[in-house]
Amino acid sequence: MIRKEIQDTELLAHLSSIFKNEMTGFVMADGLYRGALFNATDLVNQMAVQWNHGPLETMILAQAYIAAALLIPSMKGKEQLQLRYDTEGPAAGFCVEADSTGYVRGYILQDQIPIEKPLESWDLSPFFGEGRLKVTRFPEGSTEAFTGIVEIRYKNIAKDLSWYFLQSEQINTAINISVQFDSKARIVGAGGFFLQALPNIGGKIKPKLTKELFLKKNGLFEASELLKEKVEHAFSSCPSLGQWYAEKGNNEDLIFGLFREFNPVVAYTRSINFECSCSKERLIDYVRNLGRQEIEELKAQKDHVIEITCHNCASVYKINKDEV
């Protein structure tokens, strides 16, 4: 990947002053819930400078990158996945990838979305039509991929991803994605929140919370309706994550502020970055393995340099024909 540098000194100063690009994972309610809160401001700013899209396309792709990052906590061991959103609307959708090592990359399907009038809000539903959301997982060492597909229901990336978990994996999951622009169309804050109910815990574990928040069935503890309502209310009380990070908020203050009564425990912190495995050497090998007709067409071109753009990260490679 050829990483482009952010040149805006005012934006760079802002990015250096806010909470770091970090995901904080936690468990709460004696293990009945797990969550992850991610400050994605650095990640989506690198995406924005790399792709150089317009504000609308940048907003969609920023949300897509954050959505892919929020899938990383659901990975089992070493794994890669692809999140694809195909719609009949003007935006067409996106295709993004994430890896358990902590990278995200990908692209929007329509890089110049037609709009009929100036944007009045960041409601993206008018640009998403009917379609499908697909998650394909590639576990390390497995010879086959595992794919889950759901119909797009809300035309909202976060809500449709929650719907995917409920329908395809039968897990209640709440997702919040937020991106904040300033008056100059710069991303000054961005983040994502993932909260998921876990299977019932074993009977040997004695809940530390009050008894009315738990039920015991067949020797297993599970969340009562009261606990579910309280957790849902707490999650829905989350402020705008884009604004939270833009105003120098941090992860732990928000986690403990929202969920203190459920005794959250931080399980890990990790970085998630925009990275791509493309390289000049890989693309030279790609060109060498083209079909005979394609190679002859390249030879016939007057230019002595072949220019190739990576579709996952927008890196532009210039390859001398002599290198091929």
Region spans (language model):
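Interaction interfaces in information-processing and related assembly proteins
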Residues: 2-268
